[in-house]
């Protein structure tokens, strides 16, 4: 139990959006809340969660729990990306490219939160199409998951890392 608490303590958690939703029934409307969160260790691990409950704190707690269970590893290169990447989910498309030291995170809203908790310090990015936070987060994580490290590319091509990096 203490190991889990320690691990959770080193994760950065960010709340991206809280939304009130309603279900219409015969007797009127039933209100509930949704929460979108991202968690990351600031060193290449990131995950997102979407929770729904009758109360805001419960929705946030559910979202955080789902985010911790739904984490992926991202191969970063000294605080930036390995190469330009594209990602998409439904109507949202994102494009991200590596940036030199000192550039910072040039990204908007939901995409910025994902990149911050993932440990990316320098990146240029743009979201196209729908800017719905849930879809932008999914598209960003899709792009990060599709990023290949030089070691992976070298192994696939049967070359050395030095040949790949030029």
From Swiss-Prot:
The keyword Ribonucleoprotein applies. Signal peptide: none annotated. One of its GO terms (biological process) is translation. InterPro entries: Ribosomal_Su5_D2-typ_SF (IPR020568), Ribosomal_uS5 (IPR000851), Ribosomal_uS5_bac-type (IPR005712), Ribosomal_uS5_C (IPR005324), Ribosomal_uS5_N (IPR013810), Ribosomal_uS5_N_CS (IPR018192), Ribsml_uS5_D2-typ_fold_subgr (IPR014721). Belongs to the universal ribosomal protein uS5 family. With S4 and S12 plays an important role in translational accuracy. Located at the back of the 30S subunit body where it stabilizes the conformation of the head with respect to the body. The N-terminal domain interacts with the head of the 30S subunit; the C-terminal domain interacts with the body and contacts protein S4. The interaction surface between S4 and S5 is involved in control of translational fidelity. Part of the 30S ribosomal subunit. Contacts proteins S4 and S8. This is Small ribosomal subunit protein uS5. The lineage of its organism: Bacteria, Pseudomonadati, Pseudomonadota, Gammaproteobacteria, Pasteurellales. The gene is rpsE.
